[in-house]
Amino acid sequence: MSEAGEATTGGTTLPQAAADAPAAAPPDPAPKSPAASGAPQAPAPAALLAGSPGGDAAPGPAPASSAPAGSEDAEKKVLATKVLGTVKWFNVRNGYGFINRNDTKEDVFVHQTAIKKNNPRKYLRSVGDGETVEFDVVEGEKGAEAANVTGPDGVPVEGSRYAADRRRYRRGYYGRRRGPPRNYAGEEEEEGSGSSEGFEPPAADGQFSGARNQLRRPQYRPPYRQRRFPPYHVGQTFDRRSRVFPHPNRMQAGEIGEMKDGVPEGAQLQVHRNPTYRPRFRRGPARPRPAPAIGEAEDKENQQAANGPNQPSARRGFRRPYNYRRRPRPLNAVSQDGKETKAGEAPTENPAPATEQSSAE
């Protein structure tokens, strides 16, 4: 009986196992659907699927639970908020330093990325040595770190004195520095029509609807050139020709010359407005020489006759050579009575001794 019972039990168990097999067969298409989509996955055993009906959902929530875990790791744990402290030191080049808390006197690491409100005039984020700041304390990898660093009551930090400053006029630097106040409409009405440089403002504003700078530049450029160098450009733009003004020194020199040399009165000087102009040197009129005396005129005639008719006068255009030695004067010296003897004539006193010598012989 036991064998029969076993056989029966075995017979009964076989149909039950066969019945269990078709019952386990329907869950097979569910795991095969990913394989049909193209992912090469092996079918899971039926015993696992049948024995743990909740096992289908177990692998699904696993990645969902891992995402919050990663976000929690990214967010650091906040230890304290709105803590006041004094900057112990901060290196601008390396971008980190330490802040000493005022409550616990503990040094907290601070990085330049933790500065929330930087000085707008500074290029790099930084905090100055000895500056009082407000920050949050979070737990970092190696200890306490500062986050959301600002000035007291949330104002921007002062920054380190070693951090580079921004340029004050980056856009339109040259135009804003020497430009007038921004009253473009008034300037266009006042100076647009009477511009001395011939500039005409645009007629229709619709043509430049989107270009704001193109409307600004033509309107206030002409006043710049007039206001930049007012004393120089006013004299140059209206009248660039040289004017003639009477010079006081020349007037005095003219009066003196009229008294002495006969220069006409009212001598004028040509004055230029250009301050760098230097007038050229001009030789004045030749001075009239006084007429020579009668005796001097006769002497000149005698000298010309002695030198010869072809030779030019010795006084005008004569220049002694470099290696010239003075020769003794010819025997045409002036006599005591004031008359000259020519070089060809022999003196009257010399022949007398000659006749005496011949008679003695």
UniProtKB/Swiss-Prot annotation:
CDD domains: CSP_CDS. Pfam families: CSD. One of its GO terms (molecular function) is single-stranded DNA binding. Residues 85-149 form the CSD domain. The modification Phosphoserine is found at residues 2, 33, 52, 126, 193, 195-196, 313, 335, 358-359. Keywords: Acetylation, Cytoplasm, DNA-binding, Methylation, Nucleus, Phosphoprotein, Repressor, Transcription, Transcription regulation. The keyword Membrane does not apply. Its main location: cytoplasm. InterPro entries: Cold_shock_domain, CSD, CSD_CS, CSP_DNA-bd, NA-bd_OB-fold. GO terms for cellular component: bicellular tight junction; cytoplasm; gap junction; nucleus; perinuclear region of cytoplasm; synapse. The modification Omega-N-methylarginine is found at residues 243, 315. PROSITE patterns: CSD_1, CSD_2. Residues 1-73, 173-361 are annotated as: Disordered. Abundant in the skeletal muscle, spleen and fetal liver. Residues 303-313 have a biased composition (Polar residues). Binds to the GM-CSF promoter. Seems to act as a repressor. Also binds to full-length mRNA and to short RNA sequences containing the consensus site 5'-UCCAUCA-3'. May have a role in translation repression. Found in a mRNP complex with YBX2. Interacts with RRP1B. This is Y-box-binding protein 3.
